[in-house]
């Protein structure tokens, strides 16, 4: 058992292979957080808490004359609100009498021999290889009939602990839940830095690192999606922690909507670490008997730096979040027509692209935006999911059949959650769009957001999508979402439920995705939101790969894919080779470099292959062959970042097979100088006592030698040039 409970049922120690998490219900039934870190025994660590009268830190009535006992200074597992803890709370409740108070105390616990599900939301699931365990701690509110269940999952071999919570209203009167996070954790004695991932459209997930001080460090999204601007995954690490040293705690929210993640030192220099649904524009009305569930947060600890932490997240997401026919099945190398044609295409153009792609070994053609309704630009047509047979010279089934006869798979782009005002759907159902009565709604890309909380909207979309997919025998769908959500108002929701709409929107999207995939179980679904605007573990439950960014510039992609790698498996990274000058930056990079960067992802092309040179066509063949050769290595192997957050003139990364029989190292020169210095890089992950041959010069050395001495290139890489180096075990 990974969940250990003391004989008196008040001390809980969650054990994974390399980490421990401990909490304790004290004599006043306050649930205290004692420890999360390197694996320890099950001894009670409550002695680590130093209680003292801090002044202006009030005392609950159970403390009697003891002024040292204060909710304002104790390391808590569930900090309430309005009752004496003045730090950021985890939960806020407005009662029927208008008061704000939440004071939850320990009541009981239950242990389950399997992982837990969350109604209507994605969560880690059990496999034949590993099943989780679950601890449910029931807390009761001191002065009302409200029950809070803290839910902990443990995946012992993966070094993962999950947190979620469920609030149940057992009282006679309704309550308003105005904040409820997935977890809160008070860390007592370390100085931490936070690593988070910021950005913007076409430049997502830039890794940034700042110290956690008494001023709060907070990131989040109120855009209705996890967003391009911040990612719902952060790391708290000890000062100076690096790839191979230092303590690190990761937190990754399995959710695709508004979120917040925060850390702050308190007056005792304890760090309160929190994550969950953003409280802005959030208010859930709970009648008697109703409940609210938070999304799941995935926690993981590494005592040996960031690389191990990332590898733990890669494994848990790849094995226990990603699902479906393509969880492990080899994914086809694709060609997408978007940057080749944008909206200006017809059947003839698409078939020419497919014919050339097939000759070069590409396995699937994806038809992007513009095939439906009156969609000649991005100002009309969204919602009218009917094939424009005039533009396509027939039905989608006819085009798909022609592609399939070439021996290729066929994919299609959709943007189900959006609607154009210039569409037949909007003219028939204007109330299906989010819009506040009396206000002109905000437009973005000249489109509005469908009310995904409505069952009739989801039924329409499900019928349209499944009909097209089944009729044309579609193999792949790219599911896009090209704006943020605002003007949130539902014409069918009660007014006292409007504070629920942002969350219910996400639940509606999840519901549609679940039913769509159940109806099309063999489909490969690739997520997208203007690229990486919804690149999160919640969406990965439905789409095992996500278009990582609308920016296909190979040099910008180094930063984007670097930031993505801290939490998300390389197999989830949608990454393509595109034309130069690049359409987003105007930069010109070597064709080989573009391929090497895209190989660190699901791999494909965004161009008209009829317009490239014969030399470049040969490079496509070589890249396609390389993808097949290294597929298992890049999609299932261990990933190492060899260059870091500090400024360098090259970027390098490495894949190592799980059996350590081979490794692939890639270097890209990012800056050039006069009288250039040699490139020297680390090598990681090779078995210490095995011999490996390097493909550069056929040098054979022990793994421990490569791991410690590294690799020097004896050739000068020009700016933006790349090189792949393979290490093969000598048997």
Task: Write out the residue ranges for each language-model feature.
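Short Pro-Gly-centered flexible turn/kink motifs
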Residues: 100-106, 284-303, 720-728
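C-terminal beta-sandwich/jelly-roll accessory domains of carbohydrate-active enzymes
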Residues: 671-731
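Conserved, mostly hydrophobic/aromatic
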Residues: 18, 165, 289, 335, ...
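Carbohydrate-binding surface patches
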Residues: 243, 644-687
């Amino acid at each position: 058992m990974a969940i250990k409970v003391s004989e008196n049922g008040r001390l809980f120690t969650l054990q994974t292979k390399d980490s421990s998490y401990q909490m304790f219900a004290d004599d006043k039934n306050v649930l205290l957080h004692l420890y999360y870190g390197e694996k320890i025994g099950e001894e009670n660590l409550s002695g680590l808490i130093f209680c003292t009268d801090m002044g202006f830190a009030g005392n609950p009535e159970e403390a009697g004359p003891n002024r040292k006992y204060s909710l304002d200074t104790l390391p808590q597992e569930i900090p309430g609100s309005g009752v004496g803890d003045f730090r950021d709370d985890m939960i806020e409740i407005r009662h029927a009498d208008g008061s704000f108070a939440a004071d939850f105390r320990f009541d009981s616990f239950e242990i389950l021999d399997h992982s837990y599900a969350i109604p209507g939301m994605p969560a880690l699931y059990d496999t034949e290889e590993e099943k989780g365990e679950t601890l449910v701690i029931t807390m009761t509110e001191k002065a009302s009939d409200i029950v809070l269940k803290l839910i902990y999952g443990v995946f012992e071999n993966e070094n993962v602990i999950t947190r979620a919570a469920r609030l149940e209203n057992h009282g006679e009167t309704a309550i308003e839940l105005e904040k409820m996070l997935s977890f809160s954790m008070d860390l007592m004695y370390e100085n931490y830095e936070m690593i988070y991932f910021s950005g913007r459209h076409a430049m997502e997930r830039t890794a940034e690192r700042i110290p956690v001080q008494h001023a709060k460090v907070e990131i989040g999204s109120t855009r209705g999606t996890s967003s391009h601007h911040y990612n719902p995954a952060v790391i708290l690490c000890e000062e100076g922690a690096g790839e191979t040293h230092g303590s690190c705690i990761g937190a990754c929210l399995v959710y695709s909507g508004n979120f917040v993640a925060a850390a702050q030192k308190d007056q005792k220099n304890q760090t309160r670490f929190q994550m969950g649904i953003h409280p802005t524009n959030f208010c859930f009305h709970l009648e008697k008997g109703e409940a609210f569930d938070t999304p799941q947060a995935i926690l993981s600890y590494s005592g040996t730096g960031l690389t191990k932490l990332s590898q733990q997240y890669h494994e848990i997401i790849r094995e226990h979040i990603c699902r479906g026919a393509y969880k492990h099945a080899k994914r086809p190398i694709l060609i997408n027509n978007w940057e080749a044609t944008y909206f200006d295409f017809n059947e003839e153009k698409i078939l020419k692209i497919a014919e050339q792609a097939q000759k070069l070994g590409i396995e699937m053609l994806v038809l992007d935006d513009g095939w439906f309704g009156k969609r000649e630009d991005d100002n009309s047509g969204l919602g009218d999911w009917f094939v424009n047979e005039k533009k396509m010279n027939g039905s989608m089934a006819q085009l798909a059949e022609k592609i399939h006869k070439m021996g290729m798979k066929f994919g299609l782009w959709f943007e189900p959650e959006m609607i154009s005002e210039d569409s037949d759907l909007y003219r028939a159902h204007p109330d299906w769009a989010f819009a506040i009565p009396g206000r002109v709604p905000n437009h973005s890309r000249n489109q509005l957001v469908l009310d995904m909380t409505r069952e009739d909207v989801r039924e329409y979309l499900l019928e349209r999508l499944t009909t097209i997919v089944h009729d044309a025998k579609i193999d792949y769908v790219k599911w896009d979402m090209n704006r943020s959500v605002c003007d949130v108002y539902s014409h069918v929701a009660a007014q006292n439920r409007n504070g629920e709409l942002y969350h219910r929107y996400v639940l509606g999207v999840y519901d549609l995705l679940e039913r769509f995939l159940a109806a099309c179980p063999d489909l490969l679904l690739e997520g997208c939101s203007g690229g990486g605007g919804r690149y999160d573990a919640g969406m990965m439950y439905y789409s095992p790969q996500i278009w990582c960014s609308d920016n296909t510039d190979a040099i910008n992609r180094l930063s984007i894919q670097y930031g993505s790698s801290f939490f998300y498996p390389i197999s989830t990274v949608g990454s393509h080779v595109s034309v130069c000058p690049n359409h987003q930056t105007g930069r010109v990079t070597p064709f080989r470099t573009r391929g090497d960067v895209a190989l660190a992802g699901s791999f494909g092309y965004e161009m008209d292959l009829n317009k490239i040179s014969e030399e470049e066509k040969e490079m496509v063949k070589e890249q396609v062959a390389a993808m097949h050769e290294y597929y298992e290595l890049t999609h299932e192997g261990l990933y190492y970042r060899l260059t870091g957050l500090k400024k360098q003139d090259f970027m390098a990364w490495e894949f190592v097979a799980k059996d350590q029989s081979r490794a692939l190292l890639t270097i890209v020169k990012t800056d050039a100088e006069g009288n250039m210095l040699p490139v020297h890089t680390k090598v990681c992950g090779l078995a210490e006592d095995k011999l490996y041959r390097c493909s550069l010069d056929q040098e054979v050395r022990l793994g421990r030698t490569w791991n410690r001495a590294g690799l020097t290139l004896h050739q000068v890489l020009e700016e933006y040039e790349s090189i792949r180096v393979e290490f093969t075990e000598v048997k």
